[in-house]
Every structure is written in C-alpha cells, then in structure tokens.
Amino acid sequence: MKVCQRKTIDTEKMSSVGDTACADLSEKKDNEKKKRSRVKQLLSDVKKQVEFWFGDVNLHKDRFMKSIIEQSRDGYIDIAVLTTFNRMKNLTADVKLIARALKNSTIVEVNDEGTRIRRKEPLGETPKDVDSRTVYVELLPKTVTHIWLERVFSKCGHVVYISIPRYKSTRHSKGFAFVEFETQEQAQKAVEMLNNPPEDAPRKPGIFPKTCRKKAVPFDAVTQDNDEDGKKKKTELKNSTSEETGSNNMDQDGMLESTVTSEPNLATLTSTVSKKAKKKRLRSQSFEASSGEDQFEMSSKMRKVEEEKSELKDLSSENKDEELNSLKKKDDSVLKAKRKRKKKLKERLKVGEEVIPLRVLSKKEWLDLKQEYLTLQKRCMAHLKQSVFQINQKPTNYHIVKLKEDDTNAFYKDTPKKELTSGPEFLSGVIVKISYNQPLPSKRCIKDMLSELSPVAYVDLLDGDTEGHVRFKSSEDAQKVIKARFEFQKKYNWNLELLSGDHERRYWQKILVDRQAKLNTPREKKRGTEKLISKAEKIIIAKAKEASNHIRFDD
C-alpha cells in the first residue's frame, strides 16, 4: 500500500511540473505575439518626406529631382533612387516599406510591382508671388535645423519651404535662412511677430555677427538689462551688509572713524568726540591713584561720552535706513517698468515659452538691400581698379624722366612682339653631372660657387638629393668647370662629370618631358574681384617691403 501511495504522489508531482512548463511556454508565445515592430511613426515620416520631394514647391526649386522626372518617359522614378538621399538613409533603406508608406498618398502613386513612383498630377508653372510669401531671417545659431525653424515659424502660419544656405567647406549655416509661407498674410504676420533683434546686433540687416565655430548666437540678449540690474542690486546689498557687519565687529574707535567716512555731515561731531575720549583716557591714566570722589567724577564723565557715542550710532543707523529705503524704492520702480516691457515682448514674441531674438524682414526688402550692397561693391571695386592702374603706371625708379607721347608710340612700334619659346634647344657638351656622398647644398649655393668660373644657365636639383645636373650656357663654359674639377673635389668633395652620348640624350629628353608636364598642369584662374584683390594685395606687400628698407645717405 505504501509503495502505491508513493507512486501516486510522484505522478501527481510530475503532472504539476508539466502543467507549469506548459503554462510558461504559452505565456512566452503570447508575449512574442504582443511584441511587434512599431512602424506607424516611421511610415508617416517617410510619406511626409517623399511628398515634400514630389511637391510643387520643392520641384520648382530642386533642379535635380525635376531633371530625373523629366528624363523618365512615363514620369516614374525608381524608389531605390530615393534611398540614396541622406534624409531617406536616416529613415529607412527598405523599398517595400517606402512603397507601403505611399499607398494612400494624395501626391504620388506607386506602380503595381511596388518599385517605382510618380506624381499623380503634372507640374504646373512657377508661381510669381514667391518673394512676397517669403521672409528673410538672420542672427540664427550655427546649429540651426529645418525642424527648429519650422517649429518657430509655424506659429505664424503654414510653412511650405525652408532654405538654409551653408558653407561648402564646413557645411555650417551662414547665419541666415529663407522661410516660405502659404500666403502673403502669414509672411507679414511673421515679420510683425518675430522681428526682435537683440541690442548688440548690427543696426543694418544683412551684416551677420561673427560667432565661433559650432557656437550659437546668445539668446539671453533680451534679458541682459535685467541681469545688469540684478548685479547692481547684489553689489549694493553686499556693500550694505559689509558695512553693517563691519560696524558690529569694530571697536568704538573704529566705529567713530567709519562714521566719519560714511556720513560727512557728522564729521565735526565725531572729531570732537574722539578728541574728548582721548583726553578722558589720559586723565584716567594720570589720576589712577586719586581719591574715590575723583573716580566717581571720571566715571560720570565717561558715561556722558558713551551717551554721545550712542546718539551718533542712532543718527548714522537712521541715515543708512533712509538711504536703503530710497534705493529700494528706485529699484522697485525700475523693476516695474522692466516687467511691463518684458510682458509686452512676451505677449508679442513668445514661441514655445522662449523669447527668440531674431531679425525677420520680407524677402523683397532683403533684395533691395542686396542690390544696394552690390552697387556699393561695384563702386568700391572700380575705385580699387583705378588706384591699382595708377600705381602700376608710375615708374619705380624716380630718376627716369617721363617719355613724351611720340617717343612712347615710337618705342612701342619698334619693340618686337614676344614669340612663344619652344624650350631650351639641344646643345651637346653643356650638361655637367654633380654628385656627393652626402646631401648636396641648395641650388643657390651651387650656382654661386660654379658661377665664379663660368655662368650657369640652370641647376636641376631637389633638396636632400646626392646627385644633380648643371646646365651651362655653352660647351666652353662647361669645359672650364671640368678642367677645375679636381679643385672642387679637394675643396667640396664633389664629383663632376660631363655628360655625353646616350646619357646626354636621355637627359635632354627628360628636360622636354618635365617642361611639357609643367605647361600642362592646370593653373588656378583668378577672374573679376578675386583677381583685382590679389593684385591689390601684391601691391600692398611690395609697398610694405619698400617702407621697411633703410634709407642710406651718401657722406
């Protein structure tokens, strides 16, 4: 019987364990079913972005997208092209997910395969009232984004397009942007509501404040006055507290001196009291061994002095209290006025519980300012060009007399025109090879050393090379150097060798190849204002060098 009971208990335990295991598995399956990918927000973001790219406002400005649509016959574009854009890379690279997001779109339609999309309606003509619906914004932080601008300006109306110009090298914002609204009234509302430049901003729009790299324009410029007032109040309170603590800690003599400095009206009284106190001290020291009656008289006199001191303390404290009360009243009146101003500003410019110091004006006004700037720039450049021309016309040597017009014309007629040089002509026996077991000195040093015997045409040598070539003007000049090669070897340890035969022919081929490569290298072309400014900079550098030279007079 006991064995049967044990078996039944074991079977019951096993069945209970199995039930718990099954329950755990079912719970896990239920949890797995509940967990699903949250793509609702992603689908809406993808739809919003693609509809913006294919919208009328963007296609009138985006030449790349417009060219892709025009190149396709039926207007369809592969969805894979959109996945190459940076904005879409940040969202998703799944073509099926993009097609799923655009199923219910009102602007674009997807083909049956779900791989291509196109606009439902053809693109119309460009609207003519774009400038009147656009506002210009400046004094923006370096890290400004489209989302931030849309959040700020959407309080004034429906924002359809935002353009943030950036530098090509760093891709940082230039500090200004253009915001396009749906209607002209919304743009006018943005100008009235958000035009709040800070006090330290430049007076004329279009000139942006210089900020450090990746550093935003300070947004606490509006509350600067309040901060300054707060600082003033703090310093005044600190001074008053220090005076009170000092008066409590000082002894009686120090207290009298402080009252002299703080209250000029009581200066005479304090001086007389201090003199009396000193006299009484001397008397007390001289009459220490006197009778009890004298001591009683001295104590009564000292009491009088103490009473006078207490009266002075009361007067000084009353004056201080009056001054503090008057200062507090002034501060309260100033603060009330500031609060009223701040309330007005907040009511007019509050966007997301922050007052944003921006300069906002219509694009038409900005275009007028731009035209004014361009005309001023042209005028300045014309003046600079004229001054550069006048400087270049002046002769550098002032001892030369100016030629007459006839002489100059005759001179220009007689001078032959420069012909295009085809490079150095082949001459045998003019190339000398120079070698050394250590790096050779500079080109200038070698040219100066060899020019003592015969003139040098060119030194072909790079810094740090142990071998080089020197080209002379004639074979006779090269022979002179070769004859003196033992002297150079003793003096500088150089090995000089005259090239001939195949070695000479190869070196001449190398000269022609190097020259052609140098001529074929693209040069940086400077045109317009850049060219003019570079000329002006060269003239300034030359003038500075002339000014730095010492003037030496003959004895």
Curated annotation (Swiss-Prot):
Residues 295-356 form a coiled coil. Residues 133-211 form the RRM domain. Disruption phenotype: Mild cardiac phenotype with increased phosphorylation of 'Ser-2' on RNA polymerase II. It holds the Pfam family RRM_3. Its main location: nucleus. Belongs to the LARP7 family. This is La-related protein 7. It comes from Danio rerio (Zebrafish). The gene is larp7.
